[in-house]
Amino acid sequence: MMPLPRGQAIRRDGGLWAFERALARYGLAPVAGVDEAGRGACAGPLVVAACVLPEGRRGQVPDLADSKLLTPTVRERVYEHVVRRALDFRVVAIPAADVDRLGLHVANVVGMRQAVAGLRVRPAYVLTDGFPVPGLGVPGLAMWKGDQVAASVAAASVLAKVTRDRLMCQLGDRYPEYDFASHKGYVTPEHSAALLAHGPCPEHRFSYVNVARAGESSVGCQDGENELVIADTMVRA
C-alpha cells in the first residue's frame, strides 16, 4: 500500500475527518474505509465492510465512532445513518469453513479485497484498519486503530459489526443450544460450557484450539452444511 504524498503530516487528533480531508486536498478522493468484525470469534463468519462516505456535511454521521465504543442501540442507529448517507458500501461475509481453510489473516485479506472490488464507486485511496492489504488495485494506508481516527473506517466498522451481529442472531435461532445471539461466537464461559456439552456445530471454526478440543470429546451437531452465510454478501437498505 502506498503512503500519503511525501511531506504530508496529519494529526491523529485532528478529528475523524482529518485523513479524508487531507487526501482530498491531494486529489485522492473519494476515500474508502475498510474494517472487519469477528476476528477473535471462534464461531460464525468473519465480516468485512468497505465504505465510501461523501465529503462535507452530507457525509456527517451523528455519533459515528469505532463500533466497539458504541452501545448496541447507538450502533444500530449509526448503521442506519451510514447506509443512508454513504456514496457506496459493500459487506462481505467469509464463512467459518473458509476461515478454517484459508487461515484467519488470509481470509481477512481476501474479504477486504472483495469488499473494495465490489464497490460501484471506485475509490482513489483506501484506508484499512490495522494492517496493509496488498492487491487492492488502488493506493492505500494501513492505520493503527483506524476505526478511531478515520470516518470512513469507523463507518466500515459499524457496517461490519452490525451485519455480523444480525447474522449471529440468525445462527442463534438455528442452533439455540449455543446462545449465539448473546456472545456472538466469542469465547465466554457460557459458550465454552455449551461447546463441551454439545460439541461444535458447522458454524464453529475448527482451526481454533478450543473448538478442536471440544470436537475431540463430542460429535457435535452435524445437521446441515454452512448454509446461512454466503461468501460474498451485498447488504443495502
Residue ranges and their predicted role:
Residues 1-237:
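RNase H-like, Mg2+-dependent phosphodiesterase core
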